[in-house]
Amino acid sequence: MKFSESWLREWVKPAINSEELAHQITMAGLEVDEVAPVAGEFTGVKVGKVVECGQHPDADKLRVTKIDIGEEELLDIVCGASNCRLGLTVAVATVGAVLPGNFKIKKAKLRGVPSHGMLCSFSELGIDVESEGILELPEGTTLGADVRDILELNDVAIDVDLTANRADCFSIRGLAREVGVLNRADVTEPTIAAVATSIEDAVSIEVKATEACPRYLGRVIKNVNAKAETPIWMQEKLRRCGIRSIDAIVDITNYVMLEQGQPMHAFDLAKIDGGIVVRMAEQDEKLTLLDGNEAKLNDNTLVIADQNKALAIAGIFGGQESGVTSETTDIMLECAFFAPDHIRGRARAYGLHTDSSLRFERGVDSTLQAAAMERATQLLVELCGGEVAPVVAVESEADLPKANTVELRRSKLDGLLGHHIPSTDVVEILTRLGCAVESTDTGWTASSPSWRFDIAIEQDLIEEVGRIYGYNNIPNQAPVAALNMNDHKEANQPLKRVRDLLVDRGYHEAITYSFVEPEQQKLIVPEIEPLILPFPISAEMSAMRLSLWTGLINTVVHNQKRQQPRVRLFESGLRFIPEESAENGMRQEMMLAGIIAGTRGEEHWDIATNTVDFFDLKGDLEAVLELTANELAYEFKAAKHPALHPGQTAAIVVDGKEVGFIGTVHPELERKFGLNGRTIMFEIEWDAINTRVIPEAASVSKFPANRRDIAIVADEAIASGDIVAECLASGGELLTSAKLFDVYRGQGVEEGKKSLAIALTLQSVERTLEEADITSAVDAIVAAIGEKFSATLRD
């Protein structure tokens, strides 16, 4: 919103200068983008009148004039403007005047004729107006007066970048109201009295779309002079607000829009067939707009029509056929309230952006129409003449906006602002803003004024109180907080440590959406019904995830489609399990998941390129588990999972509890997701592995270690991990490690059995072990294995 400071000061007179006014407006939340003078810097330019005007003897395009500037002598001035004529009141730069650009006026001769000054155009005075020829001032302007004073050019134009919620400030009226509140200054509005009617003509008005147009006013004015000149004071006010003067009737409707905040439109009455109909457009209905372009309308567009055709896009743009021209004598003046929801976005749909659409789509005061109609009528009769008919009004009270009544609690006000504002100040601020305020036991209730439809909740009122009171008036006060050290147990395993480990092992961390496609998720977790979002981003993101695998599998597919031969990803995040007994009916669990696909390593000339398998991922997961627990705390047990291959799946068991799964993706799942080749993945509950064994210092033995290898024959169904665990449990304090280094099946081993080669390392911190010590420990291990698993020592 660009406005003239002098126009604003006609309404309200704060005791501050231009710079202070701009700063004050900005601090109140209406950011000032620019403050610019309305004209260039010049001196010595006076009002004059052309009393003689003749042709230059030696130049066809020059005229020799005598100018009266209210002094004893007339000035001889040569002028080349085409509109220079006898009796014209002009702006005269006298000898010694300085024009913008430090251009000094001196006595001169033009083709031999003396010239003692210059008749100025708008551009020569640094005034941004598109016009040909010299500036024409109103007849009767005081001769010799300073043009800066006559045109009130000691003024600035202030451009304010309004936020979407402050549509009430798209007018001088609204800005004056705001400045008045900030400065506790009275606002003087122009007197708007009902214009006396002299004829009874009326146009019938039918509103078919009352929800989109709850109020529509129309008035006939006959015998207007459409060729009347717009007075320079109105042209200047429009110009300083960024609007170009067109003709008197259009200028008056624009003037009322800027002054009151109510867009209006004038129709040529002779071009309206049978009355006005406010309706929705028919699909692909055509309308030629004022700019000459043809619009093909959508059926969600509100139009002003007559009985046969559309006349205008309501609140946005008029039609060419019903537009006012210089030949127009009778008009119908429109003033309406259009609901923002039915205007918003429509202008952009047709590639339009108008001052009218900007105001209507953000919201116009729904009580303003009658006053705006009388104001426009008043100006039309004054400037263009005419005979006025009564206003025809059609309203749908049920569809008009209602005032919002909002509760404001003292505790909430103090809490959000961090400062106690006296109750009398709070009531005064809200009252000056136009709210109807009532006290309650906990604070106040405030009913918003008709022009502040953005005040809807308690926080809106708090914002208003804070900004009018002045944020600078709220003292700086550092928050007081107890600095308590967070409890951090040494046994807690940081997630960052696990992330770093996986990154070091060649993984990339993925972050996928918590919302997944329901059918895909059902393939992975068919036994649980997920939480379905009522308003999802899309149908493909409508279910809360039950597993991190859905997102990771899709990420692998995405990378494989982009020719990535090797994919290694991990993710940590929440899964969401519906559970009636949980808070909000949902249990949230932190999970850690990983997935690998493609080649085992980067392509290398000296290393064979192999595809990843189950044990590659198992080794990486074991490295993670070794960070969090000792070797005896976790194990892998053969299991089944609907998303994993039946013969290549293991449950992850920690301290006897099943906390996750690892395995190769099920072939059917692989096909439906579109995976390219073997893919292995794991998922484990983070809470089950987020503790670690606290390291204990141990003496480093100076005595030699002894290794003994044993080969154990056991049933195929017995897990090798169980046998290794039994070795460690029964080996006593001398056994420092037990590692499986070979598995053999074949000749010499019965069918249905396997031979496990295990390396046992024995060492003492006190002495060198004797053979008897070693033999005794090994025999105890073999005996324990034989007793528990019916396994034997291989010959």
Curated annotation (Swiss-Prot):
GO terms for molecular function: ATP binding; magnesium ion binding; phenylalanine-tRNA ligase activity; tRNA binding. Residues 39-148 form the tRNA-binding domain. Residues 701-794 form the FDX-ACB domain. Mg(2+) binds at residues 454, 460, 463-464. One of its GO terms (biological process) is phenylalanyl-tRNA aminoacylation. Binds 2 magnesium ions per tetramer. This is Phenylalanine--tRNA ligase beta subunit. It comes from Aliivibrio fischeri (strain ATCC 700601 / ES114).
